[in-house]
Amino acid sequence: MMRGTKYIWQHEGWPHMQWDDTSFSNILAEINLLRGKLLGRVSMFGFEEQNLSMLESMTQEIVHSAKIEGEELNRDSVRSSVARQLGLEYEGLKNSDHYTEGVVQVMIDAVQHHDMPLDAERLFSWHAALFPTGRSGIHKILVGDWRQGEEPMQVVSGPLGHEKIHYEAPASKDVLGMMSDFLYWFDTENTLDPLVKTAVMHLWFVTIHPFDDGNGRICRTLTELLLSRADQTSQRYYSLSSEILNHRKDYYQYLEQAQKGGLDVTPWIRWFLQTLKLALEAAFEKTEGVLRKSRFWDAHRSVSINERQRKVLNMLFDGFEGKLNSSKWYKINHCSQDTANRDIRDLIAKGILKPTGEGGRSTNYELVSL
């Protein structure tokens, strides 16, 4: 343990954290208004549009939660896996690998079964799904169990030999007892505002740091579980991890400040709620894209569009990565280059696509605005 540094879990009274409710009462009111607006907007969607919005939100949550830790997941692979595991239709490009399937299973279990009790075995199964090889990178780790050993669990940054220690977690021998208290509180605490409870839970879990690795990802999965309980639905239409990623430096800064401070965690809760508000605002704006897709197909219901064209057009609305060109077209549809060019020219003639770029092989195409 670093001399002179007293972490939150070392204070008498831990884990009974404190906060000033008046400090974020206005933010809570704004969040609840936004939640109502978002669910009201989504309720205007048809069944297909609701599924599309949920698919996009869950894909973002999974991809961006991993990216917070510096891990890059293939977006199309994640989206295909989410769609398949939820039984949704999606015209994707890629089959998912075993690892991606496991990562997606963890998130789906959390949100689809948010009302089920949380126990150690459930967390262990999630951990095993995140580390199917028993390794984190090239390092062998203990999978599916609380961390063990005498070595201190530290959060560090910087080059080897010049590391900066941001945080040191409780000793491994204390994890079992601390997690028992945490799990009991997780399922029995019902007096707190559910969003405040989610913020407190987030800090509490990462402070214990119960696993050898993957603590951040599992913590954000637990956050989604509690948000699903708060919303009283397994339908996810916003992504908190996307906003955390946008403010990653602040995320780690506020966590570190809370972990190195006393039991008053008001600043952390306020930051968490402000970030949740941003996530809801971003999600509400994105519902415009879903409505845009619906308006597009309504406006073109009498236009002759073949299956190849329909497939690519839907992908353009559903979060197509990069720019569309004829090469991507024939790869997506497994057709010839000539067929791809004919399909594209046909959509240009019908006023649906327009060319951009320099022309020739570098020509890209985008949707014409309605």
Kindly give the residue locations of the regions a language model identified.
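FIC/Doc superfamily catalytic core
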Residues: M1-L370
